[in-house]
Amino acid sequence: MREILSIHIGQAGAQVGNACWELYCLEHGIKPDGQMPSDKSVGGGDDAFNTFFSETSSGKHVPRAIFLDLEPTVIDEIRTGTYRQLFHPEQLITGKEDAANNYARGHYTVGKELVDLCLDRVRKLADQCSGLQGFLVFHSVGGGTGSGFGSLLLERLSVDYGKKSKLDFCVYPSPQVSTAVVEPYNSVLSTHGLLEHTDVAFMLDNEAIYDLCKRSLDIERPSYANLNRLVAQVISSLTTSLRFDGALNVDITEFQTNLVPYPRIHFMLASYAPVISAEKAFHEQLSVAELTNTVFDPSSMMAKCDPRHGKYMACCLMYRGDVVPKDVNAAVAVIKTKRTIQFVDWCPTGFKCGINYQPPSVVPGGDLAKVQRALCMISNTTAIAEVFSRIDHKFDLMYAKRAFVHWYVGEGMEEVEFSEAREDLAALEKDYEEVGAETAEDDGADEEM
């Protein structure tokens, strides 16, 4: 088996995790107490869904997941919620005190106490796997736990499981909506860690997903639950090929191989279609071509950044449901002829497609319509540098005055770490610029036109 462990860190990680596991359980027909009526082989299991669930001898299915937070409130909700019987109590780890939006607390003082316990649990889960394939890590980079503890844990995982893939779903601060004043500090410090210790990072940002919910689902005031359900659909689409059998299956390591041209250029943009409410879905036919156009539309991106301002290096299109390769090839051919969608000149083909016959499921009482087919696109584009430059700018404004820095230094951090992290991100912006620049021998040709 090729198992995958999910690690959910901090409030954002845990709440996205709730939405994901709720959806996985629906897709596989697993009850909130872990029973799965349709599964005939009790105890053992080489079914595809065993990549995400382990089975006990009594036929209970337990998610291969760990939830961690430095303060208990969010995870206590899981301990008392609908799915409380699904998780092993040891998989829900909480500390006593909060990281208080402070990277240094999550990374040095408070986080240090929990990290060994946490790695111990990871080891226990890893020991149950016959062929561990990698980790999915969920966290935000604006808060304290997600950014500080998140990067601490990723560092330690790199040491203990160096060869395993680490895919990271990180919620980045949005341009307008802010939940903390020190977000720019936490994000820059955390990204510095993500650069080194993750293989692929998927960028999400609340504002972009808010706008999607408002515009496409007609939700006046989207709540985090609405946002997380949408994110869960994306993550479910990425992992369907690991949990079900399909025509063109995509493995986790395939993401890396096809999307990451250089080790540092591994921050991906995700988009999903159809984001559509039940009333509308009834009147629209969502063909493969239409879905393919929609995912390239800047307004369906899950992070606030406009791909038209950059060039694509690679795209991964994951279709699910009633889709045949012929339609996909036709749709991709149309996209290639579009002038608005530009690829870097050193990557002529740039598309990887996956098809999975399992149609998308929806959470009952949720906002999304039940549809026959859906598409999730993961793209590597130079436009994602916008996200970094935005955060860097805010970081510079605050750091020039050394505002709030004493909170970090007081928790045992060195001030030099700030400038190191900032320089690393400046280098990253530069990398993105160079990757998108025209190759030297083309310059002459362009001027003649």
From Swiss-Prot:
InterPro entries: Alpha_tubulin, Beta-tubulin_BS, Tub_FtsZ_C, Tubulin, Tubulin/FtsZ-like_C, Tubulin/FtsZ_2-layer-sand-dom, Tubulin/FtsZ_GTPase_sf, Tubulin_C. GO terms for biological process: microtubule-based process. Its cofactor is Mg(2+). The keyword Plastid does not apply. The modification N6-acetyllysine is found at K40. Disulfide bonds: none annotated. It is found in: Cytoplasm, Cytoskeleton, Spindle; Nucleus. Pfam families: Tubulin, Tubulin_C. Mg(2+) binds at E71. Its EC number is 3.6.5.-. One of its GO terms (molecular function) is GTP binding. GO terms for cellular component: cytoplasm; microtubule; nucleus; spindle. The active site is at E254. Acetylation of alpha chains at Lys-40 stabilizes microtubules and affects affinity and processivity of microtubule motors. This modification has a role in multiple cellular functions, ranging from cell motility, cell cycle progression or cell differentiation to intracellular trafficking and signaling. Keywords: Acetylation, Cytoplasm, Cytoskeleton, GTP-binding, Hydrolase, Magnesium, Metal-binding, Microtubule, Nucleotide-binding, Nucleus. It catalyses: GTP + H2O = GDP + phosphate + H(+). Its main location: cytoplasm. Belongs to the tubulin family. Dimer of alpha and beta chains. A typical microtubule is a hollow water-filled tube with an outer diameter of 25 nm and an inner diameter of 15 nM. Alpha-beta heterodimers associate head-to-tail to form protofilaments running lengthwise along the microtubule wall with the beta-tubulin subunit facing the microtubule plus end conferring a structural polarity. Microtubules usually have 13 protofilaments but different protofilament numbers can be found in some organisms and specialized cells. This is Tubulin alpha-2B chain.
